[in-house]
A protein has these predicted regions:
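Secretory-pathway ectodomains
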Residues: 27-527
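Bacterial Sec-dependent N-terminal signal peptides
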Residues: 1-31, 527
Length: 527
């Protein structure tokens, strides 16, 4: 897009959202009636340079006949004023899998059970349907999609459709090819009518599971776990880069030649350089990631060709042990293991890493049930003798050399995320990915200034005290020199509730009242 076109679009965007218009005034609340069905994953924020400019919501607004529904795409500005109201009719068997916003367009990935197609629809911000991309799916792929729909609850965040700046969107979906389970990457342009699909053809392994990590202007970066057997065998972790221009794999790294191997968890472009930053737990070369425990947290700098130019290792027992009580298995006292949610780089070159704890505990109910089943000569395949508990938030600070210089634990209420037999046998990494997939972590989002000079890390919690008993929304706020905490009590009779980032110092709360068929929105000040 040319500089002139960018200026023109931003001018229209600002005028459309009422950011310079005196006719639109800030309001604290908004209600929308006749909402027959609302899914929280069908909603999102509209932002520019890291600042909230509005919101979008897609919901079922009417029933036309026994085969057809009416759907509404509602666009609001940052003060909850209605900006656009787009209605369309489509199949009753239309289900929205994911949605995303990329700065200039909103994308929706639908599964149409009538036509047996996956449909990507891309709208601009004046409500015009720019492009529709469709492709058929078969029964084998549909079985995987049904598992996906079951696992992704309304409380879950976007998992499989991601923005690539103003150029377009990318989706990463499971696929079955005969007995082989693999994945496919679909790219959808929002600038021109262009779409392409990448399916790995050179993987010898029968099972490959891909997770999107991030992107650059020219790369889609994935973590891919590969193995030869569904129920056994040690998976190997690969960092895979797909070139957007050539539509081919640019690199596939498994670090097998190193003394340590990285399990990539987070990828972000390194500002001011063409390189990317990769962060994740690391293991000794001969460790099995499906069974063994990580040795610490590694930070790699990598070029877009896949060449690693810098490696820094921080051990759990040594480096992190100066600030947190950890053991050699990477387990923090009372917190457990860490999942990395966000990496924040500030103007003074500090690096803050947001983690959340999870751990395995004995499951009294599962033990009792297993004992009763065994006494009756039966095998328990439902309840685990252990359970997975999500614990506290952890804020870690690193210097410009990527060495840890501090870490603080922020207490929150432990909650049971998983109590089936899968918690008994799977590794810490597999469990962490599963918790992320089902939306079990309490981390919500990070918001702040465009340059990260000030930011707030937000998460949900549940308080049980004499003064208050119920859900809370919490913020760990950084003002450029120190951290403070804040929280909002979320008493509600709504069927479902979700908190969104909002303009500076506020959050936006959306509630769906299923019985009344009503969506309520309100802005609340932090503090």
């Amino acid at each position: 897009m040319s500089h002139a076109k960018k200026l023109s679009f931003l001018t229209v965007l600002v005028m459309m959202l009422g950011l310079v218009s005196p006719m639109l005034h800030a309001q604290a609340k908004l209600s929308i009636d006749k909402v027959y069905s609302a899914y929280l994953r069908n909603s999102g924020t509209i932002s520019a340079q890291g600042q909230i400019k509005g919101y979008f919501f897609l919901y079922q607004s009417d029933k036309i006949d026994k085969h057809t529904n009416e759907y509404t795409l509602q666009i609001l500005d940052e003060n909850l004023n209605k900006v656009r109201n787009i209605k369309f009719e489509d199949s009753k068997k239309l289900s929205l899998l994911e949605s995303a916003f990329n700065g200039s367009s909103i994308s929706f990935l639908f599964k149409n059970a009538d036509n047996k197609t996956l449909d990507m629809k891309i709208y601009d911000l004046d409500g015009k349907l720019k492009y529709t991309y469709s492709r058929e799916y078969d029964k084998k792929t549909d079985d995987l999609m049904k598992q996906y729909e079951t696992l992704h609850t309304d409380e879950g965040m976007n998992k499989n459709v991601f923005d690539m700046g103003e150029e377009g969107f990318v989706s990463v979906l499971p696929m079955r090819d005969g007995k082989q389970r693999t994945y496919e990457v679909d790219y959808y342009s929002s600038q021109t009518k262009k779409q392409w699909t990448y399916v790995p053809t050179d993987d010898a392994e029968k099972y490959a599971f891909a997770e999107y990590l991030g992107c650059t202007d020219s790369l889609i970066i994935l973590e891919v776990l590969k193995k030869n057997h569904a129920m056994s065998g040690n998976p190997t972790s690969h960092l895979v880069g797909i070139n957007v221009v050539t539509k081919k794999k640019q690199f596939d790294l498994d670090y097998s030649d190193d003394n340590q191997k990285l399990l990539p968890s987070y990828v972000a472009p390194l500002e001011g350089t063409p390189n990317v930053l990769i962060i994740g737990p690391y293991y000794d070369k001969d460790d099995k990631i499906g069974k063994d425990f990580s040795k610490g947290l590694a930070v790699y700098e990598m070029t877009t060709t896949g060449k690693v130019v810098n490696k820094v290792y921080n051990t759990w027992s040594g480096d992190f042990g100066k600030y947190l009580a950890t053991n050699r298995k990477g387990k923090i006292d009372e917190v457990g293991y860490l999942y990395i949610h966000k990496v924040i780089r500030t103007p003074d070159h500090k690096l803050f890493v947001v983690g959340e704890g999870y751990k395995r505990q004995a499951n009294a109910a599962g033990i009792a049930f297993t004992t009763l089943m065994a006494m009756g000569g039966h095998v328990n395949n439902s309840f685990g003798v252990t359970k997975i508990v999500v614990t506290d938030m952890v804020m870690m600070e690193f210097n410009d050399k990527y060495k840890v210089t501090g870490a603080t634990i922020y207490d929150k209420t432990n909650n049971t995320a998983e109590a089936s037999t899968m918690s008994d046998y799977n590794s810490q990494h597999v469990i962490a990915n599963y918790l992320k997939m089902i939306g079990a972590f309490d981390y919500e989002f990070t918001t702040g200034e465009a340059d990260n000079s000030r930011f707030a890390v937000c998460y949900s919690d549940y308080e049980r005290s004499h003064e208050y008993h119920g859900q809370t929304f919490n913020a760990i706020q950084y003002n450029g020199s120190k951290f403070t905490t804040d929280k909002i009590q979320l008493k509600s009779k709504a069927s479902t509730l979700r908190v969104f980032p909002a303009k500076a110092g506020s959050v936006m709360i959306m509630e769906y009242f299923k019985k009344d068929k009503r969506l309520d929105f309100r802005l609340e000040k932090l503090g």
